[in-house]
């Protein structure tokens, strides 16, 4: 079918042409039905599809693709990837280096077009037909039966078109062309995979003779919240009756007097169509509510509203709304929700599915919301565009505060290689040709999402510098919707219009610098719209930020970057499932694994980082002394009596006593509760208090553990004296043996053999170790360069001297190591008659910061099961112990590794605060004991992890088990991933005389 096609390269590149014939924006209606006919028909499913490299290139043969979906992701499933591949870049634009372009220009040689086509037949009784594209990346043009209908940009908000005049009886043909790049691509430089397609649902809809075009629900409250006034501002087309039912009361009005209505339909550059008028009428209904049930994340109370349209007394349309009553305001330089100072415990959330990209299923959205709720997250920033409306509906229902962010990021036009390089090309600034394009994006979001109580703040976009246009956007938000505040982080970079943002918002600022800023600039509340960069093994020091929110009233929390890794599910070269990141499809330029920076893995498995988030964001802070619990209730609206307080004592991880108490403590207050029984005084004695949710809440079941606190003391007594073992000193080796055990130390090598019950446990020689596999954060701050010596120091340490002495109950073997810089490191092995070996390594050099200080034990492959007494059940690090609970925990070495680095291998799997550990399997095992040491058991050495960039590049995971016992391992950091080191208190150092002592045993 030939198309009347007005789309040209010049049109696509022109920032002043961002829509043609697009209908006015309006609120999203989650439930709009008619008893007589369907009002909406989904066109999701299989569409005919063909592809061209650019506007002048020939199209491919017809194929079939699925809508919603991305062209490039579906192309991956076809031989040769005929429709291109996903392309990942962060700040730089995807055409950088391919074509020299400036804003107002777009790629010509490579600007792929995907042409979708399908037929449809109108349902009976439809007198009109409209098309809704809920998401088209990045621009789309529409034809019906070959007649040009319209054009739209702005990837993440709906575009609606009137196709009625082009419809004919019987079968109709709909064609949609999607363009990968347009002028709007300069405004959509978000940190994500660059792809194109119809990635959200496509729908047809009709309008009955009387129709609800729009509704805006507005609220006001008495000062003490004892009453509320709720107003429904409605726009209605056609003639008939409109009825609103709310809180048990019904109000109605007659409509039908024609009124001229600017439809917003645009032809060319802003020229309104003079022939378009509709009989749209404004009508309002106001309801009084006594003692309203207020909405909050803790108590997401929703009222049901129903708006009915009748024609000559017959119902023709019904719209359901859920209304949350809440007041959000800025008062005395603090943000208040329902009169209470709010603390945002948030995450940034890109829409993502590892198989379908930003086409996210409802099941995945529900999983996300429930997962956030059960990890004490109370807020989401929709980075950096409006989310699918269903996600916002879930936030309303389950209780999550939302920063709704405009689809705007021009990062690459001003930030060059990490520095502010703003110039005449910086967008949007005050450039008049971009003004309407930018402001329309704000209007589209506000109009669609204005009735969601979860949205507390409108954001002007992300990382788009500053200037007049952004200030005008903020003023639009305030004028149109004074019930919300306005956010924009970019004023940090450009203070020309500081009033653009109602709050100071920054990214990745250390707590110390936040304190300094607020001391000098206390004019506004402060939030971190991005902090604690979750790339790889990260999020160290996260609790510092949360604790500061309860010390400084002006600091009101922040949003972790980010919620989910953006890995793409693929089959790796070894035939196993895996995840791809930037560059894996040959995409260049690329920022490689920078898209893998989430708390949750691409397939929605939680990492141990989420354990720390849950603890840091807990609604209760529980601190224990030896005799009482001090519980700070950090809720805004929930009393402490909503929780059962479970007191449990244990010795060496074994339960002793248990009691359940309840206590009253108002939100914001603190309670002191004396232990119902004494802390034991034997072994590793521990008291644990857990706060258990008594009643179910949306997304949270009864019995949910909201918070916990612990205190423990080690009362371990001295061991019994036993006869010394036998010393066997020969020319090449020194042996120490006793009943059912034998240790052999090779001269020039060190500890080369451990046999228990006649079974060899070592796979290779035990060695000192000072190295960990670099994390993304390590690489970002050049730590491998700074510490490179310590990689070789352990690998090539030379055991120059071996001595042995039998004295008392011990045989002590000293292995004197020489490091590549010439310094010596003595390690003493004191072995008793039971086969227990006390190991002490003592630093002889000067003050030195090390990545790690300990010993590495390559064990036999059969030893795969770990049981330990320490912080668990999953990984903890020196700067991320929050969420780790003292107890006895068990794991399989290979299965444990799989949950940490399925995308980009790096250091992982450590356990801190370990007092004892056993590694067992199909052969007799080995035990380790220390005084709260760091312990890990992995299938790989740090060097093997470091050498791999994907899982398939690692050696087989069943060749050995690598145990490391450490005095310390440097913290993982996470203030950012491009220069920030871990905090000073977890950048550990040794000095002359520093020693590490632990024990191995049968």
Question: Model-predicted segments: where are they?
Answer:
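Short glycine/proline/serine/threonine-rich loop/turn segments at secondary-structure transition edges
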Residues: 127, 167-171, 289-302, 680-686
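Beta-strand-rich binding/interaction modules
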Residues: 144, 227-270, 283, 305, ...
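Catalytic cores of secreted or luminal carbohydrate-active enzymes
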Residues: 190-211, 566, 575-624, 634-642, ...
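Short strand-edge motifs at loop-to-beta-strand transitions and within beta-strands
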Residues: 116-118, 157-161, 281-287, 669-675, ...
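Beta-strand/loop-rich accessory regions of lumenal/periplasmic or secreted enzymes
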Residues: 71-77, 83-89, 180, 296, ...
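Accessory beta-strand-rich segments of carbohydrate-active enzymes
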Residues: 2-7, 12-19, 33-34, 48-52, ...
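An acidic-aromatic loop/edge-strand motif
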Residues: 82-106, 153-155, 163, 167-228, ...
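Extended substrate-binding grooves/exosites of carbohydrate-active enzymes
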Residues: 2-35, 70, 147, 186, ...
């Amino acid at each position: 079918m030939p198309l009347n096609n007005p789309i040209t390269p010049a049109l696509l590149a022109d920032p002043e042409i961002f829509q043609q014939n697009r209908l006015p924006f309006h609120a999203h209606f989650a439930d709009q039905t008619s008893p007589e006919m369907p009002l909406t028909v989904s066109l999701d499913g299989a569409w005919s599809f063909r592809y061209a490299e650019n506007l002048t290139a020939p199209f491919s043969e017809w194929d079939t693709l699925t809508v919603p979906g991305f062209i490039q992701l579906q192309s991956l499933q076809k031989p040769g990837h005929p429709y291109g591949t996903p392309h990942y870049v962060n700040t730089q634009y995807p055409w950088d280096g391919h074509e020299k372009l400036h804003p107002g220009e777009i790629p010509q040689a490579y600007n792929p077009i995907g042409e979708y086509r399908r037929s449809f037949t109108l349902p009976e009784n439809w007198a009109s037909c409209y098309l809704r594209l809920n998401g088209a990346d990045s621009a789309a043009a529409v034809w019906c039966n070959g007649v040009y209908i319209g054009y739209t940009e702005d990837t993440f908000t709906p575009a609606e078109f009137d196709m009625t005049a082009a419809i004919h009886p019987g079968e109709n043909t709909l064609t949609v062309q999607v363009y990968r790049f347009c002028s709007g691509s300069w405004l959509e430089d978000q940190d994500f995979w660059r792809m194109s397609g119809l990635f959200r649902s496509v729908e047809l809809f009709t309008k009955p003779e009387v129709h609800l075009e729009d509704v805006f629900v507005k609220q006001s409250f008495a000062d003490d919240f004892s009453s509320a006034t709720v107003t429904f501002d409605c726009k209605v087309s056609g003639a008939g009756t409109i009825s609103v039912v709310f809180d048990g009361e019904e109000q109605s009005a007659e409509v039908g007097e024609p009124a001229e209505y600017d439809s917003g339909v645009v032809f060319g550059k802003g020229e309104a169509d003079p022939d378009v008028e509709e009989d749209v009428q404004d009508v309002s209904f106001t309801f009084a509510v006594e003692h309203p049930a207020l909405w909050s994340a803790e108590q997401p109370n929703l009222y049901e509203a129903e708006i009915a349209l009748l024609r000559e007394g017959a119902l023709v349309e019904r719209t359901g709304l859920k209304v949350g009553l809440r007041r959000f305001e800025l008062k005395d330089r603090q943000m208040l929700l329902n009169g209470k100072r709010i603390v945002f415990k948030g995450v940034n959330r890109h829409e993502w599915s590892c198989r379908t990209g930003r086409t996210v299923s409802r099941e995945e959205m529900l999983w996300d919301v429930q997962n956030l709720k059960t990890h004490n997250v109370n807020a989401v920033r929709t980075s950096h565009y409006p989310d699918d409306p269903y996600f916002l509906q879930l936030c309303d229902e389950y209780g999550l505060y939302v920063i709704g962010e405009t689809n705007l990021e021009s990062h690459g036009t001003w930030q060059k290689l990490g520095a502010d390089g703003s110039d005449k090309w910086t967008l949007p600034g005050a450039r008049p040709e971009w003004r309407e394009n930018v402001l329309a994006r704000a209007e589209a979001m506000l109009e669609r999402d204005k009735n969601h109580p979860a949205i507390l703040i409108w954001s002007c976009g992300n990382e788009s510098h500053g200037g007049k246009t952004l200030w005008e956007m903020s003023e639009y938000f305030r004028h149109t919707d004074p019930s919300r505040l306005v956010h924009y982080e970019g004023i940090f970079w450009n203070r020309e219009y500081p009033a653009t943002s109602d709050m100071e918002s920054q990214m990745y600022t250390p707590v110390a610098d936040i304190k300094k800023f607020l001391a000098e600039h206390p004019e506004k509340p402060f939030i971190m719209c991005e902090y604690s960069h979750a790339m790889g093994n990260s999020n160290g020091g996260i609790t510092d930020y949360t604790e500061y929110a309860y010390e400084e009233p002006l600091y009101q929390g922040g949003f972790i970057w980010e919620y989910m890794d953006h890995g793409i599910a693929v089959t790796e070269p070894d035939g196993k499932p895996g995840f791809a990141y930037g560059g894996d499809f040959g995409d260049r330029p690329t920022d490689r694994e920078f898209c893998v920076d989430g708390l949750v893995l691409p397939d929605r498995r939680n990492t141990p980082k989420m354990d720390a988030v849950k603890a840091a964001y807990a609604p209760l802070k529980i601190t224990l002394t030896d005799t009482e619990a001090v519980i700070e209730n950090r809720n805004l609206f929930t009393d402490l009596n909503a929780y059962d307080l479970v007191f449990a004592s244990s010795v060496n991880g074994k339960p002793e006593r248990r009691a359940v108490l309840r206590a009253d403590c108002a939100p914001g207050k603190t309670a002191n509760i004396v232990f119902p029984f004494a802390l034991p005084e034997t072994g590793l004695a521990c008291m644990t208090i857990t706060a258990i949710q008594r009643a179910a809440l949306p997304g949270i079941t009864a019995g949910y553990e909201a918070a916990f606190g612990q205190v423990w003391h080690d009362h371990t007594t001295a061991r019994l004296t036993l006869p010394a073992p036998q010393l066997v000193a020969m020319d090449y080796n020194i042996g120490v043996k006793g009943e059912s055990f034998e240790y052999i130390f090779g001269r020039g090598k060190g500890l080369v053999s451990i046999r228990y019950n006649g079974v060899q446990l070592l796979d290779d020689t035990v060695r000192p170790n000072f190295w960990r596999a670099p994390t993304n954060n390590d690489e970002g701050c050049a730590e491998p360069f700074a510490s490179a010596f310590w990689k070789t120091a352990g690998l090539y340490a030379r055991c120059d001297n071996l001595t042995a002495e039998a004295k008392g109950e011990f045989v002590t073997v000293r292995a004197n190591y020489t490091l590549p810089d010439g310094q010596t490191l003595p390690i003493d092995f004191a072995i008793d008659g039971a086969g227990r070996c006390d190991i002490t390594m003592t630093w002889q050099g000067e003050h030195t910061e090390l990545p790690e200080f300990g010993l590495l034990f390559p064990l036999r492959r059969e030893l795969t099961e770990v049981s330990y007494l320490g912080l668990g059940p999953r990984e903890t690090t020196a700067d991320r112990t929050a969420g780790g609970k003292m107890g006895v925990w068990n794991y399989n070495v290979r299965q444990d590794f799989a949950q940490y680095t399925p995308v980009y291998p790096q250091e992982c799997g450590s356990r801190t605060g370990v007092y004892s550990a056993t590694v067992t399997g199909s052969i007799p095992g080995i035990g380790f004991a220390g005084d709260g040491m760091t312990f890990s058991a992995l299938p790989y050495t740090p060097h093997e992890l470091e050498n791999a960039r994907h899982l398939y590049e690692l050696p087989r995971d069943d060749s050995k088990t690598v145990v490391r016992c450490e005095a310390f391992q440097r913290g993982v950091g996470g203030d950012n991933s491009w220069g920030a080191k871990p905090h000073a208190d977890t950048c550990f150092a040794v000095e002359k005389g520093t020693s590490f002592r632990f024990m191995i045993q049968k």
